[in-house]
From Swiss-Prot:
GO terms for biological process: translation. This is Large ribosomal subunit protein bL32. GO terms for cellular component: large ribosomal subunit. It holds the Pfam family Ribosomal_L32p. GO terms for molecular function: structural constituent of ribosome. Belongs to the bacterial ribosomal protein bL32 family. Keywords: Ribonucleoprotein, Ribosomal protein. Residues 1-18 have a biased composition (Basic residues). HAMAP family: Ribosomal_bL32. Residues 1-27 are annotated as: Disordered.
Amino acid sequence: MAHPKRRISRSRRDKRRAQYNAKTKAPAVATCPVTGQSHHSHRAYWFEGSLYFKGRVVMTKEK
């Protein structure tokens, strides 16, 4: 039976798998019900000087 000559490290294996996954999956984009802004899912985003997360203002930028 064929078998590998050298053991493949976890990092090398995961790098190979990451290339395949990056090509096949599109980033998850959500639309905020409050602002109507499109953004990445499960991420906070800035809109008109305020930081939003899950439809709520988390932080406001001071001028």
